[in-house]
Regions:
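N-terminal accessory segments
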Residues: 2-200, 206, 220, 232, ...
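A glycine-rich, basic-preceded beta-loop-alpha segment at the flavin cofactor/substrate interface
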Residues: 213, 218-254
Length: 276
């Protein structure tokens, strides 16, 4: 006869423990965004004016749009995917320098996103609490036809680069990929496979200078970073050695008229054995 009250007691106790456990779990997972946001802003104020215009906490109404705009892999655009605590959208060098220094100061992981084109979402997901430094505002392009060079910031897309070069010259080009929404920073940091590979090499083979911010917040170019680091950032992977701000590359000659053709083969026609 005492079984039912005992079961009721155990059920109530279990339910209470479950509620406490869930609450504790949610509380532990919930990021201390306001606190981190204020600490981060206070730190950034030392390096730039009005940092609140470029820093978005995950409580900001604009946060979801900014985060999702450059998530190229839908697998990581889910409610269960861990989100960054903050997104920083730099507009000038000091913003990047301050972000690197402040992320190091508060001991939080920093992810650099330049277009978001990677199969594993490496630039916008992490198992640890993290901040995204999103380079989409960093997209200025300067084309110097006379000297046959171009300076392109990391957030510019390949499509934008091709168009700006075409505006200035019909006989100059840059060897890079075919996807117009891939950003320069990530593409060139990974080597830059392109359609003119056989004649002009990889994209990185045509890079003659770069501007980066290193882990100490120093602004460096090819001369000040040295040839070893300059060699490493051209294919060594985005964000491995610093934050890429811009690349300077030589333009290559291209014909005014280009002939494009397409060959289609079916399996019945031994398409698997067909190699161009």
């Amino acid at each position: 006869m005492a079984t039912k009250p005992r079961l009721a007691y155990l059920s109530s106790t279990f339910l209470l423990l479950l509620v406490v456990t869930v609450f504790t779990s949610v509380s532990a997972q919930a990021p201390e965004s306001p606190s981190l946001y204020n600490t981060f802003l206070q730190c950034l104020t030392k390096y730039t004016n009005n940092p609140s215009n470029i820093v978005f906490a995950n409580t900001n109404p604009k946060f979801p749009t900014i985060l999702q705009n450059y998530i190229r892999n839908a697998r990581f655009n889910t409610s269960s995917t861990r989100k960054p605590l903050l997104i920083v959208t730099p507009q000038q060098e000091s913003h990047v320098q301050g972000t690197v220094i402040c992320a190091k100061s508060v001991e939080i992981q920093l992810k650099i996103r330049s277009g978001g084109h990677d199969y594993e979402g490496i630039s916008y997901i992490s198992e640890e609490p993290f901040v995204i430094l999103d380079m989409f505002n960093y997209r200025r392009i300067t084309v110097d036809v006379k000297n046959e060079v171009a300076v392109v910031e990391a957030g510019a897309t390949l499509g934008e680069v091709y168009y700006r070069i075409w505006e200035k010259s019909k006989v100059l080009g840059f060897p890079a990929g075919v996807c117009p929404t891939v950003d320069v920073g990530g593409h060139i940091s990974g080597g830059g496979y392109d359609n003119m590979l056989r004649k002009h090499g990889l994209s990185v083979d045509n890079v003659i200078d770069a501007q980066i911010v290193d882990v100490k917040g120093n602004l460096l170019n090819r001369k000040t970073m040295g040839e070893d680091l300059f060699w490493a950032i051209r294919g060594g992977g985005g964000a491995s050695f610093g934050v890429i701000l811009s690349f300077t590359f030589k333009l290559v000659p291209v014909p005014k008229t280009v002939t494009v053709f397409r060959v289609e083969k079916t399996l019945e026609e031994n398409a698997t054995d067909f190699v161009l």
